[in-house]
Amino acid sequence: MIDLSLRPRAWSKVARKANALGPLDGVAEDSANVTARVATAASLATLPIINTKPEGFETRAAAKERCAHKIEILRKGNAQEQLLAEKLGRCRKDDPCNSGACDVCLGNYRLWLYRQSLPIFAARHNWTRASVIPAGFLKAFDGLPNVDLSALASMIDKRLARSSLRKRLAFVGIDISLNLQDNEIVGWQLHLYMLIEGENTLRLQEAIKAAFPPEPTAKVPHKFDEVNDPSNRITYLFKAIFKRRSRYTDANGRPRTKGLPLKDSDLRELLPFLDQHPIGARLILRGIRRNGSRLVIINK
């Protein structure tokens, strides 16, 4: 096991030094070369702790303001929702609530993920982003309380473990949107954003498609692109803001999709669901694991 949680001064500096060590696709190299290069990248990243944030990252004040709006909505709900409002209202910097429904705590978690992922990206420089809407991930409105997020994450992990991509590193985030068609609710759509080690090849795409067959109602169930700097994508993979996705046909007969804010009734279903799971339950790691407050690459 190679500990890659050492804090880099800046992504660009560490990446330049790590890439100077030579090519690595994470699959073809023998284990000795992988271990040596990863260890060297880790030693290059032994720099003072940083306070850097991704460009455009939400401020704590903005997160608190959005959370305050949610608290107002929950206070008008049932007993469970009112208890959640109290929990979120008690959240403090020195005593965080660690709720998956708390914008401030989610922001802290996303920032931790960003910083911990930097040396991993420095060690493995070829990455592909995949957006996946799998069959069976569409849930009825009012049905979120019946979703076992832990079991869902385990299923995603097992599907990747059984695929030809099982030896590659991967970050997988579960996102949630409320889908509408012509202003009629279709349901809660759980979907995946992945950052997976390796170039954006046909082989990688076909492996993802085989592991996650498409949702029949999705217009574009699989989307792939090469990632030059995965550090810019990691926070997008684990989102803190959830939306309605409204599909319609415009005046020219072309299909369109518009992102809209969730309504109060939507939030009263979503927020208790997020609260009942650990804050990192929507994140699946492959070839990487959490060791205390650090992320480490697991050598196999």
Region spans (language model):
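Right-hand nucleic-acid polymerase module
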Residues: 1-188, 198-300
